[in-house]
Design a protein with these regions (language model features):
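Long, distal/terminal scaffolding or interaction modules
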Residues: 1-277
Length: 277
């Protein structure tokens, strides 16, 4: 086993973190990075250098909100485990790698992600999946506001976000493509509705599936609510199975619940505001 430390600027304090090098233990193509008290720049520098040096599994311990973990990684086959709380923009711009968080994740997970997979064994914050263009994100618990905003798809690149708990306002806002799933089976807020208000506001592409009941008053004027049909369930099943496998849950029990489909009624909901009809 090799212990090493990345080079860092002179010792100092930034936002409550010491500018210290993370302690790295490496064995073959796997490495553990202790990031206790380490600033996000030092952590991400260490991850990038390890991946460039042939490491395929990076285990991050002591995470306490350091942001940009896995951001910009374009190396398929690389896996990052985060033990603790993953900070803002985890997996941002990621293209092919996998990030698994054993804890909660803050805002912006999967921001503009192109491919790869993110698994969060906990809750996630706001703007989850912002502008995603591909890849898959699975969150075991509750999620925040504006989840799936501006998700988009192109040809075979179809982003997927599956949330096991409940969501707040503006779920699926301005969606242009992709698949957004809300299961409501793992939540800290059993007394609250599955989704907040303005669900699908401005949505003009893609589809949302919610396990349970969604009322018209909860949705934007740009979407319609229908019962999920057999074709919808055939799309849902493999996603629910992947979710269940990731978190050790029962896919059949989840699929037994009623699902509704939320989809746009127009692909140009605001055309009359900026173009002649």
């Amino acid at each position: 086993m090799i212990k090493a430390a990345v080079s860092v600027p002179p010792a100092g304090v930034i936002e409550g973190y010491r500018q210290v090098a993370p302690v790295i233990e490496r064995e073959g193509d796997a490495a553990t990075v202790d990031t206790t008290g380490v600033y996000f720049q030092q952590l991400n520098d260490a991850i990038r250098r390890l991946v460039a040096d042939g490491v395929t599994t990076v285990r991050v311990t002591g995470a306490n909100g350091q942001r940009y973990i896995g951001a910009g990684l374009r190396v398929p086959g690389v896996r990052i485990e985060v033990h603790g709380t993953a900070g803002n923009d985890t997996a941002m711009f990621m293209d092919g790698a996998e990030v698994e968080v054993f804890g909660n994740a803050q805002d912006g997970v999967g921001n503009t992600m192109s491919s790869g997979r993110v698994i969060v064994h906990g809750d996630a914050g706001d703007v989850l999946g912002y502008g995603m263009r591909g890849g898959r994100v699975f969150v075991q618990g509750d999620v925040g506001y504006r989840v799936g905003i501006h998700m988009k798809a192109y040809e075979k690149h179809v982003p997927v976000v599956v949330c096991g708990g409940k969501a707040r306002d503006f779920f699926g806002e301005y969606m242009a493509g992709g698949v957004l799933v809300l299961l409501g089976v793992n939540t800290h807020f059993p007394e609250q509705p599955l989704v907040g208000g303005f669900t699908g506001a401005g949505m003009h592409g893609g589809v949302m599936y919610v396990r349970g009941t969604v009322e018209p008053w909860q949705c934007g004027a740009e979407v319609g609510i229908t019962e999920a049909c057999e074709e919808d369930l055939s799309v849902l099943r493999p996603l629910v199975e992947e979710y269940a496998e990731a978190f050790g849950e029962d896919a059949e029990e989840i699929m037994d619940g009623p699902f509704v489909r939320i989809a746009p009624v127009s692909h140009r909901p605001y055309a009359k505001l900026y173009a002649s009809m």
